[in-house]
Amino acid sequence: SQKGELEDKVYCIYISPLKALDNDIEKNLEEPLKGIEKIAGKDLGIRKAVRTGDTTQYQRQKMLKKPPHILITTPETLSILLVAPKFREKLSNVKYVIIDEIHSLAENKRGVHLSLSLEHLQHLIGQYTRIGLSATVSPLEEVAKFLVGYEYGVERDCKIININYLKDLDIKVLCPVSDIMLADSEDTRLGTYNLLDDLIQENKTTLVFTNTRSGTERFVYNLKKMFPKNYNDENIMAHHSSLSKEVRLATENKLKEGKLKVVVSSTSLELGIDIGYIDLVVLINSPKSVSRALQRIGRSGHKLNEKSTGRIIVTNRDDLVECSVLLKDAKEGKIDKINIPQNCLDVLAQHIYGMSIENPWDIDYAYDVIRKSYCYKNLTRDDYEDVLSYMAGEYEELEERYVYAKIWIDYKENTFGKRGKLARMLYSTNIGTIPDSSGVLVKCDGETVGKIEEDFMERLKKGDTFVLGGQTYRFNYGKGMTINVSPANGPPTIPSWFSQQLPLSFDLAMDIQRFRAHMDTKFRYGKSKQEIMEFIYDYLYVDDFAANSIYEYFVEQYTYAKIPSNQRLLIEYYKGFGDRRFVIFHSLFGRKVNDALSRAVAYIVARQYNTNVTISISDNGFYLSAEGTLGGLEAFKQLTPENFKNILTQSLNKTETLASRFRHCAGRSLMTLRHYKGEAKSVGRQQVRGKILLKFVQEMDNDFSILKEARREALEDYMDVNNALKVIELIANGQMEIKTINTVIPTPFAFNLVSQGYLDVLNQNDKAEFTKRMHKAVLEQIKEKLKESDL
């Protein structure tokens, strides 16, 4: 620029995951550019502009005539620009590509698609510098590989600059009552709001994170209702993804202008949208991973040398232990590992279509370009050719279901290219990896009784019962975005809160398990309360109240039963009300792992014992329940490292989980088009078509590439089959023993699982009362045990 040699071309592409972030970046570039011009002593004429799906046709034409030197965009828009002939020419001089919030892209299919686009861009223009900006993430080396990709099977060079150690953290775990177990639910509720109000009033601006959208709305409503002098419509607002873009933008602007005392959010403010200065971040209950905790708390003191201040409010003993270990890991820099999806065949199909639009490709060369992406470095030739075969319409049966060829293949010349004049339009209007979603209507006897979320519907299979509006219903069948139910009695098989829960990370779960093992050792070696309390103070960063609550929790579990840990899987046989029996697996591995384990066990039980099984899962374990005999342990022991994945895969057939995942994959791979000739297809129509296609494909070829991807996504992304397999291996090689116990009252560690699942029909007050009654009964049992042992 100083030499006056800037051409009308793009030199730098800045990619962020959110359109709102793009707009922030453009504004925030103004000052640095002015500073550069001031140093240079002249107007350098460096242009910047945002290009997203919201950019008008007029603005796009303007960019073609005079393109920005710094182009700010999203992953999806970059993919479209790579196949736009006129604008593609403007990218020929790109020297830098900057990816903001790379951690939020790397862990999902948007990142997978972006990694292919980066290789496509390199194919077009040659070498360029890639820069990734990330919040706290681990392992940095893997994210670096994701950023730069591979060359001839060897990872490209990447310099890593880690500045996390420069950030000063002030994090504490707080409890709203002096004794979590003895306080009733109303005391805990009032204590939570009083504590939260105190924290907000002590600071200028506070950001509060709940883990659900419903929780966000509830906290805003109750703060205004309970403290009308402190909160009103002018100084407190909610921010979550279900609110309109206009409402979210108004909240962000008010925050920047310092007009808000507090904002309550679910997850929508985790990424680095510019919201001005935040003094304090409060997390209501566990954020379920160290990286998420640090990301949220990092919104306070957002500048490099400023302290980040966070408080985590816990409301039960499981949360207290979980957050105390999380706090230890955060302070000691131990971050959960990121999971980057591999070999996603639906995204590959979409990208191959995009490549074909540019010009014909040599099949071997295209394979080499694709495998330069970190996400496809291990892509097999068979999978690649299967996707090409599908895209070329070689499954002739699919034409019966209106799935037509998108590309042609010339095997003699070993090339492929686009088919049809509408290719660019179809690609541009159907690009992307985020599936359309909508509320699912629940109908009973022809009457609509409410809505559930689609990811909740995924859990349902015929005969499952759940609670909606205080009533229990039995799931009969689903059709499109409507499900048919019947009134039901008895406990629900699927807890109604399931769909909005954040899953506990496997790494944090295993650290909690290790703490459990340490505590178990102290008790077994006869250490005194004082010695164990000293260990808790030394090991965790907690105050007197918290340390004592943790001690009491563990001493009750140890005295009444056994302490499960990373060395011991405890299986508890508990007889519930009536003839109902429970097999409780104390498997603290996180909900995604427990989802996989419980499905596999339930599948064996249902197949071998012909029993209608109820499942309830949490981060801390799962239970199977049925009337009469239940072979839960016997079924679990049949799982081996060799058969586990196959059994879990079989359990997915005829489930809503597979149907929903297939619908998403069919959309990404362009089997179903979300938009065609200007018409958008409703989610309901997509759902119906997805189910018809799934059944057709299963009969046509059970190893069809997109069906194969739907299974992979369900197993690896929706559940966590790989870490579940690690658990099976730990047991198989003797590193984790299985111990069983029989109880007339659930053990303390099982209280929350039993009350949240089996008693989902109860309100929070009744659940708390039930838990207190169980706790009292356990203490009576412990007294009897102590008398018998003369301790």
Describe the function of each predicted region.
Residues 1-414:
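Helicase motor core with emphasis on the C-terminal RecA-like subdomain
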